[in-house]
């Protein structure tokens, strides 16, 4: 196997005749179930005609469709109905993690019997490798991986290879490279009851799949040996593991068990073990990659020396030789992604293998909030390319590092299956693909109409806002406020707090999980006002929102464009009493168009309600624990679910919660342990029969966005490093105390 090397830093453009990779996929081995949507509601309003039109055109083979659906019209329900009606696996593409998490929760409820999976970036913190020539500053890559999300990514790819009834909810990070389908699937292996196999051979294969032997801290992606018993914690499981019992070289029994209690859950006839990393590489490929990397290194060193760049040559040689030694010894190295093209055997400039290569041929793609998602896809590879060329120019990386990149727009466009673009404000590219034709979903099943809009002068806008926010809070509703800058959001939070309001801010410096918690706390009434910039827009489902205030609405630009204003206005459309205030001294073109479109929709919605004798009612939705899948405990709801059960059930719940709390503390997950402690207190209150008024009030979970808690990115980076160091030291101390 000979792998081509890169001799230039030029990025070849793919022409219109570009043909994407279509790797063969293994035969499905797990039984699949028909997609069956579980809901108390039937399609209403514009939903029936939208579902019918979309299904009809998909069956006719139309590659592109646009669903123009206003906020609260049930676009997610429409997508789910289309999937159920067509019985086809689907990928739901969201512009960010928050919306992806929200969609994941909804599809999980809609399809409890099917494989609904989550695929987003697994980085909690990520500082890419970079070099700044002007100041001669090298910035080393630094990151923190979220283990729960990594597990969900493995579960997603495994489901795509094993089942037909799969729905993947992903963010645009799915356009970045992962391991190739053929390598990832070919390195799996089966174990059968009664099979003759040497235990040492299984261990060798597990190590090749990047599983680690760990007799002390048995966790996901590890294995341990106890005499004739081998225990494996698969990469895609959260709280179950496999136990393989041998009699000599024969597999006597395979069972599934709880790794915490050791209790056997089920007996199995066979298991299929997938790799612990999407980037596993077979040994022959590693050797071929090693040879190709050396050839490219020699070629690049000759270029540097010919140009008199001796420092760059020395730097590149030392770094690359060290990486090659690490790969030869362990099969991996720090920054191995920069050699990803060698490991996949692809030619220079070819697209990397991504999640799209895992999709079956009959898959559907729904691009949610397409007006925001499509521009993201279009711009992802450009900034990445400039950073990588600088690293290669100054000898920090080989030229092939630029092949570790996200898909370019034209590559994604060629690879995507039949697509439905979903948005309240579709962009020009989507409408161009459909010739300006779209399916409209304006009428809401609830009869809610778009909110009334009022324009007020900027003079004394903050004091007026405080008055309106207090009035809204007194009525039992929440307020959303959008500003133009992070600094203004933080300063306004402090000012409104001093004015007696319960208020938080949310912007890009707030961690993803914290953002979800902030929205949950807002809905529960922990605080009444949330101030943001660009995050209080697409897809936020807050029926309790009674007021949306847009400060400096007449400052024409990206944050106050027609699309941005329509999306922001839509946040008040789930509440029958919702209203919008735009603060501006003049009405800009964007404001005029946004107000005109909102009024057009209002007229149509009011006419429908009148014709069908519908009285609009605020959406009633329980506050779901979206982040429950990320290992966070929802104390108030968790305790509430045990209410009215008999004493035996309550006692068992107390015992299980106490066990989970102790386990979390042992794993140094102190926040989770504290939350479980709160659940335990509430369960014990119920056991004692204390009345509800004696229970504690709803507590907020998010610590972010409080007045006076401004943090810069460097502050967060320091905190992440300090946290990582503390955990590492605690782990080492624990091992020393156990005599290891």
Curated annotation (Swiss-Prot):
One of its GO terms (cellular component) is cytoplasm. A motif (Beta-hairpin) lies at residues 122-145. Residues 1-36, 687-740 are annotated as: Disordered. It is found in: Cytoplasm. Its main location: cytoplasm. The keyword DNA damage applies. Residues 461-627 form the Helicase C-terminal domain. Residues 56-444 form the Helicase ATP-binding domain. GO terms for biological process: nucleotide-excision repair; SOS response. Residues 8-33, 712-740 have a biased composition (Basic and acidic residues). GO terms for molecular function: ATP binding; ATP hydrolysis activity; DNA binding; excinuclease ABC activity. Residues 651-686 form the UVR domain. ATP binds at residues 69-76. InterPro entries: Helicase/UvrB_N (IPR006935), Helicase_ATP-bd (IPR014001), Helicase_C-like (IPR001650), P-loop_NTPase (IPR027417), UVR_dom (IPR001943), UVR_dom_sf (IPR036876), UvrB (IPR004807), UvrB_inter (IPR041471). Keywords: ATP-binding, Cytoplasm, DNA damage, DNA excision, DNA repair, Excision nuclease, Nucleotide-binding, SOS response. Transmembrane segments: none annotated. Forms a heterotetramer with UvrA during the search for lesions. Interacts with UvrC in an incision complex. The beta-hairpin motif is involved in DNA binding. Belongs to the UvrB family. The UvrABC repair system catalyzes the recognition and processing of DNA lesions. A damage recognition complex composed of 2 UvrA and 2 UvrB subunits scans DNA for abnormalities. Upon binding of the UvrA(2)B(2) complex to a putative damaged site, the DNA wraps around one UvrB monomer. DNA wrap is dependent on ATP binding by UvrB and probably causes local melting of the DNA helix, facilitating insertion of UvrB beta-hairpin between the DNA strands. Then UvrB probes one DNA strand for the presence of a lesion. This is UvrABC system protein B.
